[in-house]
Structures are given as C-alpha cells and as structure tokens.
Amino acid sequence: RINNDIEGAYVFSSGKNMGVFKAVGFPEDVGEFYRLDEYEGYAWTAHGRYPTNTPGWWGGAHPFSLLDYTIVHNGEISSYDANRRFMEMFGYKCTLLTDTEVITYIFDYLNRKQKLDLEDIASIIAAPFWSEIDRMEPEKAEKLKYFRNAFSSLLITGPFSIILGYTGGIMALNDRLKLRSMVVAEKKDMVYIASEECAIRAICPDVEKVWSPRGGEPVIVELN
C-alpha cells in the first residue's frame, strides 16, 4: 500500500532476519556504501543488472522482496502483462517498473497464501509442455493438468533464470526451454549458483562439483 499510495515512498525490505540493499553503481561501491563486509548470513544473493527494456533506477535494482521472499532474475518475461493482471486480482500492485517484481509476488501468493511447496510452484511458473505431461504417470499428470488449468496465467514465458531466497534456504530455476544459462556448484557444505561458471570460480576456484540444471528443474538448497 505504501508503494502504491504514497508518492515517492517505497518499502524495499520488510522481512525478518533478511535485508535487501539496492543501488545504481558498481558492485564494489555498493558493497562499500552499505558496509556489507560487516554482515553475516547463511545465504547471499546478488545481481548486477543492466536494464534494457525498463528505466535504470535504484528501485529497479535487484533483489526484489516481499516479507521473507527475495528474487534475483536474469532474463526477460514475455508473459509479464498476463502475470501482472492475475496478481492484481488478489491485491498485488506492480509499481517498480520492472518485470522481476511480479515474480516475487507470485511466490508469495502461491507459497504463503495457497500453501504450495516450491516444487509445485516450479511446475506452475515453468510448467512442462502438454506433450510431456501426456507421457507421465496418471497421478502426476492429473496434478500437473490441474495446475496448468488453475494457474495458467502464472506460467512465466520468455528466457529467465531466477534465484528465490527465503527463510532457511534458496531455490534456483530456469525457464523450461533453458534459454538463459544457470550453473550450480558445490564444495563441502557450500552451494554456489550463478549465470556462468566463471563467476562461481572467482569466489571458489576449487569447487568439487559443477552442473547445469535442466530447464524447469528446481534446485532447492536448505539449511541442515
């Protein structure tokens, strides 16, 4: 309501034990400005965004958050208008001039309000094709058919890779055609996710395992 009704006022971070930092500038300058080296956390997400279809302003910087959900997103959502109109029916307003905002609201609506788990949400926003569903076991196929019919307006189309942060974990997801790259790596009890492997190796050069998830395949990592 603040974002929608009070001109010039925005809430960018409102979670418990979670913080969101937004800015326009070079990553090293942003980190120094917010003194990020003084913070500790079990999960960190970040995105250096170069806006191509929307205004470049600090409100459009990632992550986007609502309560304890945060989203960073690389790509372009061609289904944005359909997704936005559906979410507006349930009181969500997109005010920050970028398509990523609606993804955050979709997760809040499906997980917190509809009580769906993250794997089910992944099968809604990156739904399998009908031809794939037809080849599945009857019980699973019936469930996915229901999701595709009930939440058809929440299918996200276009190239994307996203990372969801939430209390106790993170989830990474590609579009179902894998039109955007995404790489996952592990070393001991640490998991790294990035658009490119070189970004991971810049932080941890000697990772033990590296792989690229399939399109529409969620990677869910939670605290022990």
Language-model-detected regions and their locations in the chain:
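Conserved short alpha-helical segments that host acidic/polar catalytic motifs at enzyme active sites
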Residues: 1-224
